[in-house]
Amino acid sequence: MYYIKKTIEVAACHRLELSYPSKCTNLHGHNWIITIYCKTRKLNADGMVCDFTHVKEMIHGKLDHANLNEVLPFNPTAENIARWIVDQISSCYRADVQESENNIASYEED
């Protein structure tokens, strides 16, 4: 099995829709650090799991300097964003979404 890991930084804002009172329901921003993990049994014709630049473009191009509530079709929690990233990239099996030094959400396919 071949593996790659790509880390990107995204500056974006969001507000959460929650069932309880929270400051996170107000519009606020993060300098997100997103780590994307991809794997494959067989390298592509170029000898890669996938191109690091393409991985970055697929996520960074859509999320950077965006209001996540306007570009994503779900409540933009870190957990939901991690799942969305895995769904966007065919060879991706895990994503870590870090909204601050102490708050990180991960999604990994079984």
Protein language model annotation of sequence segments:
Residues M1-D110:
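Charge-rich, low-complexity N-terminal segments
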